[in-house]
């Protein structure tokens, strides 16, 4: 049965949690969404197999033990990301079909990554020197969930330019969910201020202009053509767009482009055209021209 409780986050804050009472205990299963879509959070207990793991539970309505903090953040943040997509775009879960949204925390040991696996999210705990537990950042959770949205819409191939666009759209929706700064991952990085910046990609060794696109090998070692590197170029174009048009219009333009116009093999130039067309569809030629200028400024 649906219930409400609270939990302690990685940073020590107390947050409200939508939970469920089942089998004589409280579990991190959010049954509060009017659509009936469930958000469920599991613990892999440092395994990297047999996903999703054990449903996070408590004998009381409070989730306060230190081993539960990563789960509290994952559960709370994902509830916010679900609400963001539903309230702004009427999108019901990543697939718009109300599929349950699953996270597993404590993936592996000192694992320095978070990922969308195709049907759920996984979060490592970080090694403590580069990353702290990766569920502690709202923009990272939004980034991963957006990979799910992309998979079900444009389905951008994860290599070269389409892959860099896949990464960029995840960063941009990460920003739309956490607009207090232009950084991505600032709440989980230990040794540097953030992972990436939309306003200043070069701060984290990313190009911010097409003239500096890096042709990297399409291998695991080469980050599949540098998808996490070359995303700096469309990220800077997004920053330019948002500063010209504001969040409210920009997020509608980006969502329309992703869900209506982009295809698996879209290039940066295709993305520019898709975003210009989306702006024209929604807001007319003046705003479309501002989007065009935002991309011209990064050499595209």
Swiss-Prot record:
Enzyme Commission numbers on file: 3.4.24.28
Top-level taxon of origin: Bacteria
InterPro entries the record matches: Peptidase_M4, Peptidase_M4/M1_CTD_sf, Peptidase_M4_C_domain, Peptidase_M4_domain, Zinc_Metalloprotease_M4
Major location category of this protein: secreted
Entry keywords, A to Z: Calcium, Hydrolase, Metal-binding, Metalloprotease, Protease, Secreted, Zinc
Residues bound to Zn(2+): 143, 147, 167
Signal peptide annotation: none
Chain residues that bind Ca(2+) 2: 178, 181, 186
GO biological process: proteolysis
GO cellular component terms listed in the entry, alphabetical order: extracellular region
Temperature section of the record: Thermolabile.
Co-factor requirement: Ca(2+); Zn(2+)
Catalytic residue list: 144, 228 (proton donor)
Cofactor note: Binds 4 Ca(2+) ions per subunit. Binds 1 zinc ion per subunit.
Record localization: Secreted
Catalytic reaction annotation: Similar, but not identical, to that of thermolysin
GO molecular function: metal ion binding; metalloendopeptidase activity
Residues that bind Ca(2+) 1: 139, 178, 181, 183, 186
Protein task: Extracellular zinc metalloprotease.
Protein family (similarity comment): Belongs to the peptidase M4 family.
Name of the protein in its database record: Neutral protease NprE
Organism this protein belongs to: Bacillus pumilus (Bacillus mesentericus)
């Amino acid at each position: 049965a649906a219930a409400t409780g609270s939990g302690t986050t990685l940073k020590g804050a107390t947050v409200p949690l939508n939970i469920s009472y089942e089998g004589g205990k409280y579990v991190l299963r959010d049954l509060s969404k009017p659509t009936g879509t469930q958000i469920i959070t599991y613990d892999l207990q440092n395994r990297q197999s047999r996903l999703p793991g054990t449903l996070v539970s408590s004998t009381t309505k409070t989730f306060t033990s230190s081993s539960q903090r990563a789960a509290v953040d994952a559960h709370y943040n994902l509830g916010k990301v679900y609400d963001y997509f539903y309230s702004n775009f009427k999108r019901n879960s990543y697939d718009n079909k109300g599929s349950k949204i699953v996270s597993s925390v404590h993936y592996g040991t000192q694992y320095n990554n978070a990922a969308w696996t195709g049907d759920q999210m996984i979060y490592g705990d970080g090694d403590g020197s580069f990353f702290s537990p990766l569920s502690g950042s709202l923009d990272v959770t939004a980034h991963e969930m957006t990979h799910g949205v992309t998979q079900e819409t444009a389905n951008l191939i994860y290599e070269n330019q389409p892959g860099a666009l896949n990464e960029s759209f995840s960063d941009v929706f990460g920003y739309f969910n956490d607009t207090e700064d232009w950084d991505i991952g600032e709440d989980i990085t230990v040794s540097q201020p953030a992972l990436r910046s939309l306003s200043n990609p070069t701060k984290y060794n990313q190009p911010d202009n097409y003239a500096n696109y890096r042709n990297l090998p399409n291998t695991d070692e080469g980050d599949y053509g540098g998808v996490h590197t070359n995303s700096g170029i469309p990220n800077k174009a997004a920053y330019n767009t948002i500063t010209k048009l504001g969040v409210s219009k920009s997020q509608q333009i980006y969502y329309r482009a992703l869900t209506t116009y982009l295809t698996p093999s879209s290039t940066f130039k295709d993305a520019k055209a898709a975003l210009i067309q989306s702006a024209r569809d929604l807001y007319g030629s003046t705003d479309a021209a501002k989007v065009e200028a935002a991309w011209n400024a990064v050499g595209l």
